[in-house]
């Protein structure tokens, strides 16, 4: 059983296997289909329920993104929204209201949740993250579906990390879903 292995050997116990949905071969999970793959015997990937819906507006390389990690763990509550929507897709962008959705983005007008009234925080149902290279984010933020939504930011910057991609504007400006 993989849990009995030392921590540094546990990733080696996972096998690279074809995805049951798209048939591409991956180790750990399929970034396209957001399903775990090649789990060792006795290992289960937890399924999480989140208190809010998480929509990740995505315009990057899927294998470079951490959005699929969130989708694998909380499939019912995480939606990856391709941006711009593929031309061949019938799916429109989700519809949000200023009362029930906020964009987690460190803009100049961004507030911390502590600066928003408790009643307004209770009304929030969806957190929207922008997953793209930093230089593309301002363009996405002008999309009519999210342009008029409130922006929220982290109250305290995360500790230094070699994993997160920081923006030149400061350590509190992270560009990965772990910022949540």
Predicted regions and their residues:
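Short, charge-rich amphipathic segments
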Residues: 1-8, 26, 109-119
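Cys/His-rich short segments
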Residues: 3-53
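Electropositive phosphate-/nucleotide-binding environments in soluble metabolic enzymes
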Residues: 13, 27, 64, 170, ...
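Glycine-rich, flexible N-terminal cofactor/catalytic loop recognition
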Residues: 31-98, 116
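Short, acidic/turn-prone active-site loops that include or flank metal/cofactor-
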Residues: 61, 84-86, 108-110, 154-159
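S-adenosyl-L-methionine/SAH cofactor-binding core of RNA-modifying enzymes
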Residues: 71-146
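C-terminal folded domains that constitute the principal catalytic or ligand-binding module
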Residues: 120, 125-127, 134-180
């Amino acid at each position: 059983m993989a849990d009995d292995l030392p921590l540094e050997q546990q990733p080696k116990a996972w096998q690279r296997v074809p995805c049951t949905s798209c048939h591409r071969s991956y180790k750990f999970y399929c970034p396209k289909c957001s399903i775990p793959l090649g789990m060792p015997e006795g290992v289960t990937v937890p399924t999480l329920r989140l208190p809010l819906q998480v929509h990740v507006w995505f315009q990057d390389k899927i294998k470079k993104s951490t959005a699929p990690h969130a989708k694998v763990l909380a499939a019912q509550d995480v939606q990856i929204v391709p941006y711009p929507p593929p031309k061949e897709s019938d799916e429109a962008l989700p519809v949000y209201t200023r009362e029930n959705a906020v964009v987690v983005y460190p803009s100049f007008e961004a507030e911390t949740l502590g600066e928003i009234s408790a009643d307004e925080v209770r009304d929030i149902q969806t957190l929207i993250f922008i997953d793209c290279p930093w230089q593309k984010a301002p363009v996405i933020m002008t999309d009519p579906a999210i342009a008029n939504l409130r922006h929220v930011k982290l109250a305290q910057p995360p500790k230094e990390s070699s994993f997160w991609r920081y923006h030149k504007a400061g350590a509190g400006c992270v560009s990965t879903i772990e910022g949540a």
